[in-house]
Amino acid sequence: MREYEAVIGLEVHVELKTNTKIFCNCSTEFGGDPNSHVCPVCLGLPGVLPVLNKKVVDYAIKAALALNCEVAEYCKFDRKNYYYPDLPKNYQISQYDLPLAKNGYLEIEVDGQVKRIGITRIHMEEDAGKLVHQGNLAVTPYSLVDYNRTGVPLIEIVSAPDIRTPEEARLYLEKLKAIIQYTGISDCRMEEGSLRCDANVSVRPKGQKEFGTKTEIKNMNSFKALQKALEYEIARQIEILEEGGRIIQETRMWDESRQVTLSMRSKEEAHDYRYFPEPDLPPVVIDREWLEEIRATLPELPDARKKRFVEQYGLTPYDAHVLTLTRELADYYEEAAKGYSNPKAVANWVINELLRLLNAAGKEITECPIKPEQITKMLELLDKGTISGKIAKTVFEEMFSSGKDPEVIVKEKGLVQITDLGELEAVVDKVIAANPKAVEDYKNGKEKALGFLVGQIMKETRGRANPEAVNQLLRDKLAKL
């Protein structure tokens, strides 16, 4: 069998977080009643004219700068003509030969190596409506159309065909999502459709420079789905070529339930859309002053923030990576770390405990019931010896479920650590007397028996005993027996 490699390019649609649509004043709010956010403009009724929302251009420029693109001084809109039930005008206002930006890139890390993925272009366009099907698409008796999404502003980010594996595709999309979220121009919620990804994929024998025949894959609504769909499609294409077959250029749909791609329609070429300049919109001229005004609003982006976390807080690259996955998480960590002397300890609690609790509860960091300063207060109780490490986890979980301050929880539940040697000595004596076999085992060289006895003491004190003091006291007493 010949060795093949995949050639993958991604087309990512990002819904911009503006209050109104790209060419009219209708709301962009998600989740309204079907066809409640519509007007004659977004429904394409006769006699209406589009008016460009300047905020859309601002946000598109911001994305282009964050992705290292060259922003055009002059760009225009075009009509993309096609017929589909979710497109009321029978054309989409998009950009064709003069897009807003081109020649950008982002970098991903693959097996410890940095790889640069080119971005061919970024252009602005309006979204289409949404078809709602009853049950399975293959057997549904009818489809309904919700036009609320029609005219919602999008940018389409087109990668160069630099991606070679499904894993690289997933890493690219994860990085792109993080960068866009950091800029604040979109919430990038894949489950709500505000970040959508189509993949173009072909395979070729290793060493061959010419591209193979590509297919386009749609309907991938998660990072995992993207990777799985590409893995399946690459294997499907290789199998066809190995059997002497020919790849058909077509659009395919990822079927999540069956974990396969299914043919939808033949793939269109650009000339099929009969692009021509949009006659109802003037070209957009972007001068240097406008560009620099937007550049000044760019936040610290994920890579720069990750590097600073390593240098400023002494974090490992991995911990810095986890904490900078979203802007909100990075902000939360910094707020907690600034009030405490040991930023590494804060990172450990946020990554190992807080994220675990958030995941279990299905919550985002923005919904976190623990305030950043409460983590600092709890760590200070730990440093003072007021609570033990084990009790700290109990307190932390209670903070998460109740939102109360750690001092209040410790007082209410009587969780102050026992450090009084007299009190500890009485418990140690009681446990030694109650467990003669474990004592004998320890004296015979079985070190595990000591752990058992420590566990019994912690159980007796409900975890409030100071572990170091218990260990030392127990060893001293056992040595005298």
UniProtKB/Swiss-Prot annotation:
> Among its keywords, does the record have Chloroplast?
no
Reactions accelerated catalytically = L-glutamyl-tRNA(Gln) + L-glutamine + ATP + H2O = L-glutaminyl-tRNA(Gln) + L-glutamate + ADP + phosphate + H(+); L-aspartyl-tRNA(Asn) + L-glutamine + ATP + H2O = L-asparaginyl-tRNA(Asn) + L-glutamate + ADP + phosphate + 2 H(+)
- Choose any GO biological process term that the UniProt entry carries and state it: translation
Signal sequence residues = none
MF-aspect GO terms: asparaginyl-tRNA synthase (glutamine-hydrolyzing) activity; ATP binding; glutaminyl-tRNA synthase (glutamine-hydrolyzing) activity
Pfam families (UniProt xref): GatB_N, GatB_Yqey
Keywords from the UniProt entry: ATP-binding, Ligase, Nucleotide-binding, Protein biosynthesis
Tell me which EC number(s) this protein carries. Answer: 6.3.5.-
Question: NCBIfam families given for it?
Answer: gatB, PRK05477.1-2, PRK05477.1-4, PRK05477.1-5
Family, similarity comment: Belongs to the GatB/GatE family. GatB subfamily.
Q: What does this protein do?
A: Allows the formation of correctly charged Asn-tRNA(Asn) or Gln-tRNA(Gln) through the transamidation of misacylated Asp-tRNA(Asn) or Glu-tRNA(Gln) in organisms which lack either or both of asparaginyl-tRNA or glutaminyl-tRNA synthetases. The reaction takes place in the presence of glutamine and ATP through an activated phospho-Asp-tRNA(Asn) or phospho-Glu-tRNA(Gln).
**PANTHER family named in the record:** GLUTAMYL-TRNA GLN AMIDOTRANSFERASE SUBUNIT B MITOCHONDRIAL AND PROKARYOTIC PET112-RELATED, GLUTAMYL-TRNA(GLN) AMIDOTRANSFERASE SUBUNIT B, MITOCHONDRIAL
- Give the multimer and partner information: Heterotrimer of A, B and C subunits.
**Protein's recorded name:** Aspartyl/glutamyl-tRNA(Asn/Gln) amidotransferase subunit B
Source organism of this protein record: Carboxydothermus hydrogenoformans (strain ATCC BAA-161 / DSM 6008 / Z-2901)
